[in-house]
């Protein structure tokens, strides 16, 4: 399963819009973090584009519990690593993101392995999720993993929008995708990681 020409052009357009902001991100964030104290949850307003819309500067549960436990997630270094890993979240959500409430749930379609994101390189797999917005615009999320033979390495590709979060959405269950803990806006994504290690 490969992307259509229209989908490839959409990825290229999003890339062209976001890459200058991504470059700026690497320059601004180290200085913006200097304006934060240990109790801060977000970057200063003047640097809001570079913040993470869901978890701010201190990371999600995995970041806080596995990577930087016991409050270490609030150090300058942990925050810098988090924001370098999760770049331009507010910009992406505000200007290019998919508002979950605006998705026409009757148009959500899934091709491939709906559990592809849980695969972690165990086998070759993919999932393509497509939908239409209420205004008729089409959106897609393409996730793929390619294992390198019998090695312990694989390639992970995620393009379009982070629509793996709406796999299984229908008109009769859309409300379950809009709970308090669910993401309200799904960001754009163009991530290709050619060297991921399989964890046994």
Per-range role (PLM):
Residues 1-4, 80, 197-200:
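Short intrinsically disordered terminal tails
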Residues 38-127:
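Long, solvent-exposed N-terminal ectodomains/accessory regions
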Residues 5-38:
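A hydrophobic membrane-anchoring feature enriched in long, contiguous, low-charge segments
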Residues 32, 101-106, 132, 149:
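Compositionally biased, intrinsically disordered low-complexity segments
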Residues 1-18, 56, 62-72:
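Compositionally biased, charge-rich terminal segments
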């Amino acid at each position: 399963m490969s992307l259509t020409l229209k989908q490839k052009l959409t990825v290229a357009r999003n890339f062209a819009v976001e890459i200058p902001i991504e470059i700026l991100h690497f320059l601004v964030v180290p200085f913006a973090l200097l304006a934060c104290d240990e109790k801060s949850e977000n970057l200063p307003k003047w640097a809001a584009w570079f913040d993470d819309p869901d978890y701010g500067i201190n990371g999600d549960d995995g970041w806080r519990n596995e990577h930087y436990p016991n409050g270490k997630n609030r150090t300058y270094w942990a925050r810098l690593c988090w924001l370098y890993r999760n770049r331009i979240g507010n910009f992406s959500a505000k200007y290019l993101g998919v508002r979950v409430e605006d998705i026409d749930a009757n148009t959500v379609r899934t091709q491939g392995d709906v559990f592809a994101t849980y695969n972690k390189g165990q086998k070759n797999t993919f999932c393509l999720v497509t939908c239409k917005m209420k205004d008729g615009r089409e959106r897609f999320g393409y996730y793929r993993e390619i294992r390198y033979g019998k090695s312990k390495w694989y390639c992970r590709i995620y393009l379009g929008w982070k629509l793996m979060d709406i796999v299984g959405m229908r008109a009769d269950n859309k409300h379950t995708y809009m709970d308090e803990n669910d993401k309200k806006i799904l960001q754009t994504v163009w991530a290709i990681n050619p060297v991921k290690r399989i964890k046994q």
